[in-house]
A protein has these predicted regions:
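Juxtamembrane cytosolic amphipathic helices that cap and anchor the N-termini
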Residues: 1-12, 90
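C-terminal transmembrane bundle of multi-pass solute transporters/carriers
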Residues: 2, 17, 23-187
Length: 187
């Protein structure tokens, strides 16, 4: 089960990293934004992450970690997809969806970290985190290398839409993998 969680996490990272790299271009090209608006989007995304982390820390939802992770994947994917199909006049909506993306990230990263901490023996935890970080970065690097070419070929907004769909599908798929959904029931 934990192996599948890590595979899903690597896939999500593969599709999210190009979006992170393209945020400034999306603002400049699709929304004819200014340097100030590029900064604003980055700020709003970061504020969303901060607020999401605070909310997760205060709220402490009574939802299974894998469910929270999968739901956050779907929310992130939907908000990225919608950002990709917004008309150029919808900068304010784009800014709002940037906050939503940021808000959803702690609801993935927090439960993922906690899940690893509860399922892996403490003496191996550092090595597992190091290995996972290295493994998840490899496909991200490949995705980032191809991002510029793909964005030039099909447009930045289309990359957002396609990556958003891929994230939604990956997050939804995780709900149908029994070893993931039963992971917290195994004790």
């Amino acid at each position: 089960g934990l192996s599948w969680v890590m595979v899903i996490e690597v896939l999500i990272t593969f599709f999210v990293m190009p979006i992170v790299a393209l945020l400034p271009l999306m603002t400049l090209k699709n929304f004819s934004g200014t340097a100030y608006q590029v900064s604003l989007i980055e700020l709003l995304f970061g504020l969303g992450m901060l607020l999401g982390g605070i909310l997760l820390g205060i709220w402490n939802p009574r939802v299974r970690k894998v469910v929270m992770m999968n739901v956050s994947y779907v929310i992130i994917g939907i908000s990225i997809f919608i950002s990709g199909i917004l008309p150029p006049s919808a900068f304010i909506a784009y800014a709002i969806f940037s906050v939503v993306q940021g808000l959803a990230i702690p609801f993935n990263s927090g439960p993922f970290t906690a899940l690893l901490q509860t399922k892996i023996e403490a003496s191996f935890l550092g090595r597992v985190f190091s290995l996972f970080d290295s493994i998840s970065l490899l496909p991200s690097i490949l995705g980032l290398m191809a991002t510029g070419f793909i964005a030039d070929a099909i447009g930045v907004a289309n990359v957002f839409a396609i990556c958003g769909i891929a994230i939604v599908l990956t997050g939804t798929l995780a709900f149908f993998i029994p070893s993931i959904m039963n992971l917290e029931r195994e004790e």
